[in-house]
């Protein structure tokens, strides 16, 4: 009797299910980013409650159409308060959106259907309505800090219904 070939695990190829954040290669780490660019929005913190409020205002380096940094390699030199995500800080940053791939994996949760690692398509994050595309009203250079309260946005802390589905909606 010949031995049956081992059935491949459903987790084969899903490195985020089998590795800790610290075990990931730099390319695996970078690929956890879904490209929503919500982390590139200006945020306000309520001094009394600690609540975080996202705004419609982006970092000056964000290309709001592409949802990508215009100078990713040098972002920390260009923007002094740019936060580089690491395995340590993604576990403690309270402003990462609930849909953030880094946050989900750090919490032991799976990625959504629209994440490019699941869908194979970098546009599904936009199609699901999760990204900042079409929602940025200006950059930090264009809108003064004194006006940020006028630009508070509710959507970054919620997922659109279609993004919450287990699989993509039928067209």
Swiss-Prot record:
Coiled coil: none annotated. It comes from the Bacteria. Belongs to the UPF0260 family. HAMAP family: UPF0260. This is UPF0260 protein Nham_1404.
């Amino acid at each position: 009797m010949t031995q049956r070939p081992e059935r491949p695990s459903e987790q084969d190829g899903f490195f985020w299910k089998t590795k800790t954040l610290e075990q990931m290669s730099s390319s695996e780490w970078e690929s956890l980013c879904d490209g929503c660019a919500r982390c590139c929005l200006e945020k306000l913190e309520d001094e009394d409650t600690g609540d975080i409020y996202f705004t419609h205002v982006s970092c000056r380096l964000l290309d709001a159409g592409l949802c990508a940094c215009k100078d990713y390699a040098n972002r920390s030199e260009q923007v002094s308060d740019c936060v580089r995500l690491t395995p340590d800080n993604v576990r403690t940053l309270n402003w990462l959106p609930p849909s953030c791939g880094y946050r989900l994996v750090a919490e032991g949760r799976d990625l959504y259907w629209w994440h490019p690692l699941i869908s194979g398509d970098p546009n599904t994050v936009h199609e699901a309505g999760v990204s900042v595309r079409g929602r940025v009203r200006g950059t930090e250079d264009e809108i003064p800090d004194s006006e940020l309260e006028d630009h508070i946005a509710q959507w970054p802390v919620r997922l659109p219904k279609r993004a919450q589905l287990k699989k993509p909606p039928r067209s």
